[in-house]
């Protein structure tokens, strides 16, 4: 696709992937100003890419294992190396919802020490000859991650996580399957853990289908399959929080309720947040024009991809000028623009407290460091 853009068969192309941005766009057409590049920060809900943990299956029926598992995955290393530092670590399950995203939640960092401390609480105290921890009864600390095999790069990425997890005493088994087979296994809740993401849309989080007990077990305690509660998670306190989120009558009520739901998801360590992008990067010929007004600069912020806004057009006069300049060897100034006016909309600093902090949910104070076994906000 980048070659089609380079020769002018495409007017515009999404080049968000690091290899496209850093390598494929280092071409004369960009350096000579014929093709422009732009980075646009959005406030669109982020897909919660991560590893979902099935609480109905060992070892993830133990909270300590789930928290240890979070500390055992070196996600930041993947971001720094595979994604060249361009992507960001996901924190809240509902990132990208503006004021409805709880900005106090921070993903648990990679830490062999903290991972082993949690695993020890779960009874995994004895190292095997290969370094994997086990219980006194011989049960090894092992877990399989199911994922679709349609992406070779994903298999390589998860393989790197597997290597670092061994330093924590955890054995990860990769379970790549055909996309249809993987989906069936996940929805039937036979997978121990699964790498995936749901697609979220504005205007606010709707977490009931993903975590309410009615989508996990029936009245007799039987596991309900083919629901979005792939963690098979059931908790009465969470049900109340989800009901409050669903039935909220005002934005303030919804904000308070959904922040508490997101905090509960984090406390219970139901998934391992992985990576996301806060921006979309585009390459486009200089004749493609975008809005530039007081109300809309480049693109409306609540759009996943500026190409889906349909607020852009071709300036035929500029196209004629560009093609003539290209034939004559004339160049223009290289253009690489960043539109970051909507960046950090999920941050603590972005919160509008002019009407009083009492309207915002109460949240726990998160220390910079401390006891890895410090109880969660919900435990306290």
Describe every region a protein language model picked out:
Residues 1-9, 63-64, 159-168, 180-192:
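Short helices/loops that flank or line small-molecule/ion binding pockets
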Residues 12, 140-149, 172-175:
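Short, well-ordered beta-strand elements
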Residues 12-15, 125-127, 166-181:
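Short, well-structured beta-strand/strand-turn elements
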Residues 60:
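Conserved binding/catalytic microenvironments
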Residues 51-54, 103, 138-148:
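Short, hydrophobic beta-strand segments
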Residues 63, 109-144:
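Immediate post-signal peptide segment of exported/extracytoplasmic ligand-binding proteins
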Residues 47-49, 68-106, 113-114, 153-163, ...:
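Detector for C-terminal structural segments
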Residues 1-57, 68, 76, 80-82, ...:
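Extracellular/periplasmic solute-recognition and catalytic clefts
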């Amino acid at each position: 696709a980048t070659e089609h853009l380079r020769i002018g068969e495409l007017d515009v192309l999404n080049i968000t992937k690091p290899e496209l941005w850093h390598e494929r766009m280092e071409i004369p057409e960009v350096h000579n100003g014929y093709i422009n590049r732009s980075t646009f920060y959005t406030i669109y809900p982020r897909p919660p890419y991560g590893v979902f943990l099935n609480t109905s299956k060992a070892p993830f029926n133990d909270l300590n294992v789930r928290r240890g598992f979070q500390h055992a995955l070196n996600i930041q290393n993947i971001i720094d190396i595979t994604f060249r530092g361009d992507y960001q670590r996901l924190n809240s399950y509902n990132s990208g919802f503006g004021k409805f995203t709880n900005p106090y939640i921070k993903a648990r960092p990679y830490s062999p020490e903290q991972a082993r401390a949690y695993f020890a609480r779960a009874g995994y105290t004895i190292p095997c000859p290969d370094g994997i921890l086990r219980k006194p009864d011989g049960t090894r600390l092992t877990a399989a991650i199911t994922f679709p095999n349609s992406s070779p790069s994903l298999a390589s990425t998860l393989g790197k996580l597997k290597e670092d997890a061994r330093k924590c005493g955890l054995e990860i088994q990769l379970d790549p399957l055909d996309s249809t087979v993987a989906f069936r296994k996940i929805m039937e809740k036979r997978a121990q853990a699964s790498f995936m993401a749901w697609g979220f849309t504005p205007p606010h989080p709707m977490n009931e289908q993903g975590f309410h007990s009615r989508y996990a077990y029936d009245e007799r305690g039987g596991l309900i399959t083919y629901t979005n509660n792939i963690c098979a998670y059931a908790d009465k306190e969470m049900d109340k929080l989800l009901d409050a989120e669903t039935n909220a009558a005002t934005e303030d009520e919804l904000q308070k309720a959904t922040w508490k739901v997101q905090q509960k998801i984090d406390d219970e360590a139901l998934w391992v947040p992985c990576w996301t992008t806060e921006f979309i990067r585009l390459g486009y010929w200089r004749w493609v024009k975008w809005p530039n007004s007081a109300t809309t600069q480049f693109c409306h912020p609540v759009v996943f991809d500026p190409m889906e806004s349909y607020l852009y057009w071709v300036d035929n006069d500029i196209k004629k000028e560009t093609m003539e300049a290209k034939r004559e060897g004339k160049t223009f100034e290289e253009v690489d623009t960043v539109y970051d006016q909507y960046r950090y909309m999920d941050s603590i600093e972005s919160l509008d407290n002019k009407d009083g902090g009492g309207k915002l949910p109460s949240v726990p104070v998160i220390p910079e460091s401390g006891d890895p076994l410090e109880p969660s906000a919900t435990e306290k």
